[in-house]
Design a protein with these regions (language model features):
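Short, C-terminally biased terminal segments at protein or domain edges
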Residues: 1-120
């Protein structure tokens, strides 16, 4: 349970970090306004889905929420790469890109564990 709480907190902090850089992303040009919006949606969805999963009715439902959170984490990584390609500060983006990758790895492991039948 402790690891899940850590995962949820890290996902929350990831969302906060992305929300902090959203104005900078919008400032890259008018074509980046929708990118900032998509990045913000994807990054905050990771934590929201994990919160939903924490109260899942079943192990299968929790695995489903974690799979969706994984998709959102990977989408966030994509948008961050796109912003970096436009020349945004690596100093700002690198920690968020790293965290998106680490969250993806943690979520992949979590989904695998949740899909493994429990031994009674």
């Amino acid at each position: 349970m402790e690891q899940r709480a850590t995962l949820r907190e890290r996902a929350f902090q990831f969302g906060v970090g992305v929300m902090r850089i959203a104005p900078m992303v919008r400032g890259l040009g008018p074509e980046f306004v929708p990118v900032a919006d998509q990045l913000s949606r994807a990054a905050t969805a990771v934590g929201a889905l994990l919160e939903e999963g924490a109260t899942a009715a079943s192990r299968r439902d929790m695995a489903h929420k974690h799979r969706l959170a994984l998709r959102e984490a990977r989408e966030s990584a994509y948008w961050l790469r796109l912003v970096r390609a436009r020349g945004a500060s690596a100093e700002t983006l690198t920690p968020l890109e790293r965290e998106a990758g680490e969250l993806s790895a943690m979520l992949t492991a979590s989904v695998r564990k949740l899909q493994t039948p429990r031994r009674t």
